[in-house]
Amino acid sequence: MKFFVDTADTAEIADLAATGLLDGVTTNPTLIAKAGKDFIEVTKEICGLVDGPVSAEVVALDHEGMMREAEVLRKIADNVCIKVPLTVDGLKTCKALTGEGTMVNVTLCFSANQALLAAKAGATFISPFVGRHDDNGFDGMDLIRDIRLIYDNYAFETQILVASIRHGVHVLESARIGADVITAPPAVIKGLFKHVLTDKGIEGFLADWAKTGQKIV
């Protein structure tokens, strides 16, 4: 399973990229606003920090407007992935862009039927929002299971990119189900490294090692 980080904070991205475990980045207008930088410039900077896909979202709502914005965004770097909303015009844009060889991430997916349409439109990635689904009284992971089943039934190549991840359980369940990618905030990804017993184990080993009076270097 691939790990993307959901942020436009270049310092956080660089920190995670240094682990060698980061496969890509997702951004959205809200994250760009939080970064407080020029959209084009920060996207270019992010594309230089990772080799994998960097999702940059259009803000136009009509097909023609989306295509114009996508033309600007995909010139930033070869690893830019155009992010479009799951609407009629969004899927028209997806079909056109993927037909030209451009990666497309279809976002704001909340039903398996929507995911089916995105796959038929040739989406590179589909982004179902599990956290927001949970917030509205549904089980977000059930949505991922349904999409996985449908995509496997028809051998769709669209990758399931689980979004709106709130905690480590979402990551674990995504892996169990067989999602292709997860995207999570930096804090959630960093939290995966941590376990209280790991910390206690290190403390114990170091205490015992200190008693030997030895050094390795």
From Swiss-Prot:
PROSITE patterns linked to this entry: TRANSALDOLASE_1 (PS01054)
EC numbers: 2.2.1.2
Any Gene Ontology biological process: carbohydrate metabolic process
Listed GO MF terms: aldehyde-lyase activity; transaldolase activity
Signal peptide: none
Keyword Transferase in annotation: yes
Record's subcellular location: Cytoplasm
Biochemical pathway: Carbohydrate degradation; pentose phosphate pathway; D-glyceraldehyde 3-phosphate and beta-D-fructose 6-phosphate from D-ribose 5-phosphate and D-xylulose 5-phosphate (non-oxidative stage): step 2/3
Gene3D superfamilies assigned to the protein according to its UniProt record, in alphabetical order: Aldolase class I
Domain of life: Bacteria
UniProt entry tagged with the keyword Disulfide bond: no
One GO term describing the cellular component: cytoplasm
Family named by the database record: Belongs to the transaldolase family. Type 3B subfamily.
Function statement: Transaldolase is important for the balance of metabolites in the pentose-phosphate pathway.
Name the UniProt record assigns to this protein: Probable transaldolase
Species whose genome carries this gene: Novosphingobium aromaticivorans (strain ATCC 700278 / DSM 12444 / CCUG 56034 / CIP 105152 / NBRC 16084 / F199)
